[in-house]
Amino acid sequence: HDEMAQLFWPAMPVVLEHEHYGLSKKRGNWDSELLVESVEAYHASYMSIHWWPREELAECREAIDRINRRIGYRLRMDNASWPQKVALGEAFTIESAWSNAGVAPCYKGGFPCFTLKDARGGIVSVLVDDSLDVGTLPVAAPEQASTLALASTFTIAPRFTERGHCFFRA
């Protein structure tokens, strides 16, 4: 019935609920591989467990580990580079590459955020690049997520020069 999910998963999360594990196993019907395939086919964002969780995890560990690497959205910053030093008032660029390794989009979206700290670990600046909405990153088959390059240019503590009295002080 995964064709029905094709109507919904691009716009809203899909929740999977499987048969009671122990009962299905007792009848000889359980197949962990089908569970993994269902996450892919339905583009599942959530899955409920119907059995004793520790028992199901112990007996289906490999399949559950594979599911956990794919279910929902999996935003990855695949690489990043930045200057060794940044000066106040001067522009600098952070180069990064982003992908979604999950089966579903990040429905609400969001934007990459970078936090710069000083040598003592104190926060100097929190910077957001609103040119990439991570909700637009495509989903793909396992190990085939496409990477999107992003060049984010920021200036910390830019100097403001009042020209023509456009700056209002209260």
PLM region descriptions:
Residues 90, 108, 146-148, 164:
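Residue-level preference for beta-strand/loop junctions
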Residues 159-169:
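Short glycine/proline/serine/threonine-rich loop/turn segments at secondary-structure transition edges
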Residues 66-119:
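Surface beta-strand/loop "capping" patches
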Residues 32-82:
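Catalytic cores of secreted or luminal carbohydrate-active enzymes
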Residues 1-53:
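Catalytic-core regions of glycoside hydrolase
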Residues 125-161:
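A beta-strand/beta-hairpin structural motif
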Residues 115-129:
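Short aromatic-acidic-glycine turn motif
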Residues 59-64, 108-113, 167-169:
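Composition- and surface-driven signal marking solvent-exposed, interaction-prone regions
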